[in-house]
Amino acid sequence: MAERKLKPEIMHLMILDNCDHKCNLCCNKMYDIDKIPVATVEEMKTVHTVCITGGEPFMSNINIDRFALNLKKQFPNVENVYVYTSGSAFVFNIYNFGYNFLDGINFAPKTKGDWEQLKYASAHLREDIRESIRTRKSNRLYVFKEHVDLFENNYKYIAKKLNLNVLYRTWDKEFKTPDNEIFRRLPILLN
């Protein structure tokens, strides 16, 4: 019996390769960025979820929330737009724009500095911004095994305060995209 090929439902969309971290196990070191296929209109018409990734998306020169709105307007099939961030650049850009069209923010702190930025954000954000984050469809906080003790002893309350679903993870040395997902990039990276 021939293997059935699923149509892609989820697109991980790299919008830039710029990042403020030099993580030892960064997944961007696993592939040649120039060989990542460019997202096509045909592919965009098949997905219901777009996960904005980078590099660090909040270091781009665009308004991420407006980008999410434009994706949904141009591709009505796109129901969900999520963004992945280490947290630091997100906190530095928090007041530059609102969070009305993103369906969720996935935080993946990689350093103690990232954790401290999330701590600062949870304590000092304006209430309207904090509420905007809390009311997204799905917010996640990825806690890598190297940071479990740090998280459990110092930062666990942040997840509750910002309504983040905690997912404990290990660094994958090799990322394999599931059959119903694709990894693409913009034709011009927004560094």
Labelled PLM ranges:
Residues 11-13, 50-52, 81-83, 105-107, ...:
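Hydrophobic faces of well-ordered beta-strands that scaffold small-molecule active sites
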Residues 1-36:
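Canonical Radical SAM [4Fe-4S] cluster-binding loop centered on the CxxxCxxC motif
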Residues 131-191:
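Auxiliary Fe-S-binding modules of radical SAM enzymes
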